[in-house]
Design a protein with these regions (language model features):
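Hydrophobic, aromatic-enriched alpha-helical segments typical of multi-pass transmembrane helices
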Residues: 1-213
């Protein structure tokens, strides 16, 4: 990989992460029971926001593919981490698809309260499951890449440490059956954003020859 390609991948990761953080403002930002309280982007289409979030996940996958090549894709840990990250991002995209499109289509397709309630509960459970699965898989992938990132640079060591922390938090929350509500979604997004930005910095500041420090 050339230095420009490496920096471009880092820039893609940083941009996708930043946009995803902005899109999270579509959700309530307080614990008030008022539905619209704190929804800075409440006037944005739910479908548009979730479609854009899926686009961010796709952009992250593209940028992280460059990280895989930078970390030496012949290594088993690199390949395993890439597979876990890809599967995790796919699960998160599925969760966004359910929340952004499937739920709305269900409500529009019937006026039967019983069908709406049963379908809503089913889709909510599916969304929660995909979110939890995606979070754990991404955390596993980030931690699996930690040894390779640690060898890169100071930014790489920060990313490596964050990867281990994210995995610990994800496993703790999963084993305690805390559910995947808004607070957990925001916390998971913030933790993954820090890791992504550290990885982006590792790529942008990488040596032209691609060798570790």
């Amino acid at each position: 990989m050339t230095a420009n390609q490496t920096r471009a991948d880092g820039a893609i990761i940083a941009a996708a992460t930043g946009l995803a953080l902005v899109l999270m403002l579509h959700h309530p930002t307080s614990l008030s029971t008022t539905h619209d309280d704190g929804q800075f982007l409440s006037d944005w289409s739910n479908g548009f926001v979730h479609a854009a979030m899926i686009g961010c996940l796709l952009a992250l996958a593209i940028g992280l593919d460059g990280v895989k090549r930078q970390l030496d894709e012949t290594r088993i840990l690199t390949r395993t981490g890439a597979l876990l990250l890809g599967a995790g991002l796919l699960a998160l995209a599925g969760a966004a698809l359910v929340n952004g499109f499937a739920t709305g289509r269900l409500l529009a397709s019937t006026s039967d309260p019983a069908v709406r309630e049963a379908g809503g509960h089913t889709l909510w459970a599916l969304n929660q499951s995909l979110d939890a699965l995606g979070t754990v898989l991404v955390a596993l992938g980030a931690a699996t890449w930690s040894p390779g990132l640690w060898r890169r640079s100071f930014a790489g060591r920060v990313a490596a440490a964050l990867g281990v922390v994210i995995l610990g938090l994800a496993l703790w929350h999963t084993t305690t059956d805390g559910g995947f509500g808004l607070q957990m979604a925001v916390a998971a997004m913030a933790a993954f954003a820090l890791w992504s930005l550290a990885v982006a910095a590792t790529m942008i500041l990488a040596r032209p020859d691609g060798e570790a420090e």
